[in-house]
């Protein structure tokens, strides 16, 4: 039975924040850049280079000397020529690594002894001006140019070393410093671009950054899903085979003059495989698959939604043939004119652009649009017309055969016990979607792993089904014996009424183990498969069964001791009764539908008069009261069976169909439950005896201590 639950939900929102991680990245990039620039400046900075004359030689009238540099890479290779221009002038031609020679001139001078002195001092080389000075002196004993050039070279050799600046490094450095502002600008632009991608979205994703505004967020992928991977849905898959054939052979349809399929919309309850079917179509056809959501088109800026629609279809045209899949299309394709956000609704702009792209002036050959929604009735009529979404395929909840197939698909790689019948599991899971069935198998696997077992048994499956229906068991919850017994009466009341009313359902399980907000629950399933049609007698039986819990409480404890545990039962019963009166024509008000069973009613619309509203309320109350009286009568006339169900629940906490049917048919406890009862009684006697002995021992100890004192 359910406990009252508040309806208030707290909502939280995250404010975008500047990511600290991005700030630190920018800081370290700047530090690294500064270090690199410093190293380059140190390497390329002009510096004095020490050179030494390595060897010299005379070739005819030309004297040459080779100079070896001592500064790493830069080697000065030759003093090419040393010749006398006149008796008074000596010219030395110097070149470095193939650079045009630099001419050095030394003028004749006379020292105090009358010797001719050629002073070549303070060698410095500037390649831009062509000037060079050699530090040292050359001495010429003779006063005329009489072939004694060798002496001049000897004099130069005797100088030993001289200093030559690396002027090429200066040129390289000038080029580097010229490019440095551009390099810094490019690096900072890249850093800003990377950080902006995260800053605008709070550092969370690329989808909300300032550089992606107006671009579609659809993901392009190749699908590996095939129809064979999907259990059930045979008719739905058959309908989609035409789309697959068109994507594979578009020319065949063009030659016959057939209009290519524009779109397919899949609608039905959540978890039934709509997205999986769309992926299977793309996988079977072997074409690209663009996946997006309806809400992914919208943004806080006006016009962004329409721009993203255009961008998506432009990309799809380039990748054609392909499939565009829009999940939850109702967020962008809802009926226009219901709620006006402004004079020109932003949402309507996006919808209008989508309508134009799907069937506008531009051709869209090779692009098939598939969409999924849980509510077809809220979509705009223009979106659903032929030429846009040509096919409307309903994806229903799987029947018993399809549930068995889905369970087999998900159990392929699981080690199930041989005692497990997937058909029985399918019978116990009516109304389950494919996603819920997958969750049942996964939960059972997790339970087996938790117990360090390599095989999944039926207990794991049972517990997994309970978890999916009502949540995990709250075995640690402290429940008094009185409350535990009250819950047992409540759930036994549901089961007892369900066993005695004329209904297509049968009771499968009763438990008083708390789960979620429920203190216990009773599981009923259809006797013969899944019926899409419900008779009036079935609906009345469902109401009576729902009221069985409150009827048992009032019958056993009285009207003043009833509890809030029946709130969810009343909710269920009231909804069924209201549908019978206002939609199904199963009341004294006649065959009239007062509330549309499909579509939505605009706010403020009045569908019936005040008197009719009173009549509807009266009929709903009359149906519920009649079925409540019926439930009270069943409980009164079958009190012994009720007590046996309660006793079995208090002993075993959970009883299954076999035990329930045994009690119903034989009006006594099943042998297994009886054996558990005897074990519990024996255990209680042993504990009572032990407690009595302990108490006696304590009294004897107290007497001995008093005697000694």
From Swiss-Prot:
**Region Disordered: which residues?**
673-709
Question: What is its EC class?
Answer: hydrolase
Q: Which residues lie on this side of the membrane: Extracellular?
A: 47-171
Enzyme Commission numbers on file: 3.4.24.-
Membrane topology value:
Multi-pass membrane protein
Q: Name one GO molecular function term.
A: ATP hydrolysis activity
Where, per UniProt, does this protein localize? Cell membrane
One biological process GO term for this chain? proteolysis
Q: Where does Zn(2+) bind?
A: 490, 494, 569
Q: Does the keyword Nucleotide-binding apply?
A: yes
Q: Where is the composition biased (Basic and acidic residues)?
A: 680-709
What does the record give as cofactor? Zn(2+)
According to the record, the segments passing through the membrane are 26-46, 172-192
- The annotated active site, in chain numbering, is 491
Q: Which residues lie on this side of the membrane: Cytoplasmic?
A: 1-25, 193-709
Q: Which UniProt keywords apply?
A: ATP-binding, Cell membrane, Hydrolase, Membrane, Metal-binding, Metalloprotease, Nucleotide-binding, Protease, Transmembrane, Transmembrane helix, Zinc
Q: Give the protein's function.
A: Acts as a processive, ATP-dependent zinc metallopeptidase for both cytoplasmic and membrane proteins. Plays a role in the quality control of integral membrane proteins.
Q: Which NCBIfam families match?
A: FtsH_fam
Q: What is this protein called?
A: ATP-dependent zinc metalloprotease FtsH
């Amino acid at each position: 039975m359910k406990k009252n639950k508040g309806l208030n939900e707290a909502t939280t929102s995250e404010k975008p924040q500047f990511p600290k991680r991005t700030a630190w990245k920018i800081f370290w990039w700047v530090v690294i850049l500064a270090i690199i620039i410093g190293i380059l400046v140190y390497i390329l900075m002009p510096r004095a280079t020490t050179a030494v004359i390595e060897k010299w030689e005379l070739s005819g009238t030309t004297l040459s000397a080779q100079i070896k540099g001592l500064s790493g890479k830069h080697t000065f290779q030759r003093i090419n020529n040393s010749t006398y221009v006149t008796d008074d002038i000596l010219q030395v031609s110097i070149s470095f690594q193939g650079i045009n020679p630099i001419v050095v001139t030394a003028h004749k001078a006379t020292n105090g002894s009358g010797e001719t002195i050629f002073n070549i001092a303070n060698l410095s080389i500037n390649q831009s001006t062509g000037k060079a000075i050699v530090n040292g002196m050359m001495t010429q004993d003779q006063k005329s140019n009489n072939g004694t050039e060798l002496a001049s070279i000897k004099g130069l050799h005797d100088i030993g070393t001289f200093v030559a600046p690396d002027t090429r490094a200066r040129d390289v450095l000038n080029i580097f410093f010229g490019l440095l502002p551009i390099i810094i600008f490019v690096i900072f632009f890249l850093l800003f671009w990377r950080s902006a991608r995260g800053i605008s979205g709070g550092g969370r994703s690329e989808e909300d950054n300032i550089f992606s505004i107006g671009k579609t967020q659809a993901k392009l992928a190749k699908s590996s899903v095939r129809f064979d991977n999907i259990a059930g849905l045979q008719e739905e898959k058959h309908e989609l085979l035409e789309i697959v054939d068109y994507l594979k052979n578009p020319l065949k349809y063009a030659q016959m003059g057939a209009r290519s399929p524009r779109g397919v919309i899949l609608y039905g309850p959540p978890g039934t495989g709509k997205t999986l079917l769309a992926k299977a179509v793309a996988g079977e056809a072997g074409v690209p698959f663009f996946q997006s959501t309806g809400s992914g088109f919208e943004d806080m800026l006006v016009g962004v939604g329409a721009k993203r629609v255009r961008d998506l279809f432009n990309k799809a045209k380039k990748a054609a043939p392909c499939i565009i899949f829009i999940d939850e299309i109702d967020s962008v394709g809802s009926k226009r004119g219901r709620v006006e956000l402004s004079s020109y609704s932003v949402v309507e702009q996006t919808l209008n652009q989508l309508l134009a792209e799907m069937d506008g002036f531009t051709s869209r050959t090779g692009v098939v649009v598939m969409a999924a929604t849980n509510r077809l009735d809220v979509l705009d009529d223009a979106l659903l017309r032929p030429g846009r979404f040509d096919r409307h395929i309903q994806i229903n909840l799987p029947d018993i055969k399809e549930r068995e197939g889905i369970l087999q698909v998900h159990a392929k790689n699981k080690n199930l016990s041989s005692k497990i019948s997937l058909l029985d599991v399918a019978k116990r899971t009516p109304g389950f979607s494919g996603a819920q069935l997958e969750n049942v198998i996964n939960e059972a696997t997790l339970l087996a792993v938790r117990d360090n077992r390599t095989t999944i048994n039926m207990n794991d499956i049972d517990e997994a089904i309970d978890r999916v229906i009502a949540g995990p068991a709250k075995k640690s919850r402290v429940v008094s014996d009185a409350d535990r017994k009250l819950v047992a009466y409540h759930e036994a009341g549901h089961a007892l009424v369900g066993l005695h009313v004329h209904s297509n359902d049968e009771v499968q399980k009763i438990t008083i183990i708390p789960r979620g907000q429920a203190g216990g629950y009773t599981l009923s399933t259809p006797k013969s498969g899944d019926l899409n049609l419900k008779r009036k007698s079935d609906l009345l039986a469902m109401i009576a069964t729902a009221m069985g819990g409150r009827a048992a409480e009032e019958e056993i404890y009285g009207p003043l001791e009833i509890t809030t545990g029946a709130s969810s039962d009343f909710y269920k019963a009231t909804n069924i009764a209201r549908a019978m009166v206002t939609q199904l024509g199963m009341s004294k008000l006649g065959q009239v539908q007062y509330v549309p069973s499909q579509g939505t009613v605009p706010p403020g619309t009045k569908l019936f008069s005040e008197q009719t509203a009173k009549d509807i309320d009266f009929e709903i109350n009359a149906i519920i009261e009649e079925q409540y009286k019926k439930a009270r009568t069943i409980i009164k006339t079958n009190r012994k069976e009720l007590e046996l169900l309660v006793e079995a629940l208090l002993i075993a906490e959970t009883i299954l169909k076999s035990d329930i049917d045994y009690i119903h048919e034989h009006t006594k406890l099943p042998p297994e439950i009886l054996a558990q009862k005897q074990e519990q009684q024996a255990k209680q006697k042993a504990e009572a005896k032990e407690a009595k002995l302990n108490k006696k021992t304590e009294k004897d100890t107290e007497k001995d201590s008093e005697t000694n004192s």
